[in-house]
């Protein structure tokens, strides 16, 4: 009888990659917060740590420098090009974007206040900047050798260094923007990188302590800090989580579409509010999933064509930090 119940439970559950669940959860909280459905901040910074984790997971093992650089640049292109085109279109149609937004440099060139549209793509800017920097660093043979020799020690030292960039001397005149500028939140990215090689109990304990200690007080808003901390500590200890099988597809879809939802929800939702009741306007934000479905196919074809044209190397169908869901029977 017990075996039968256990078997039924296993049939109802599936193991899903924790990063996929976190990406789906993060994008839901981002949209809910921005669209005033519910104030659940912390999703974007959680997503940034997941980017660092997945970059370490998928790009670090690539031995060929040429192939690693190409993989990193393709990852950047798959995110930067759609964002630039979307921002340029919005600028042309009247959104209050500036040239800094279109060039993905608003974090440093834009106005200090966050009440305007200029800062809509701050996360994408940080993503692009950090992936380019890490790709360039790993192309240096001596640094690559250090990473290979000290897979945990190198990101640990880098994490300590990036913590210095969040201090008052690096605020660049605006304390609030420390939460959004590349240099001052790079430590979230590196923290995700550090989580990936935490493969022993001792390392996991150290990394968990660093997660809690570094996040506490950074935002001066405990609920946001708790949300990010719980998400990252979960990733430290669980590389897969069990979820009801019926929600695996929605989770995987939201995770896969997260970039396009992030890019487009600022434009789609306000437009729908003007012509639809508020509740339906929120549901209508799922239009971003359809945008992703179409754009992803176009991007796949473009990247495949670029790969055949410029190099005889295999082209990954997905960017390194946006892997599809890993699902297994529980």
Label every model-predicted segment.
Residues 1-163, 173-174, 178, 257, ...:
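Membrane-cytosol interface segments of multi-pass membrane proteins
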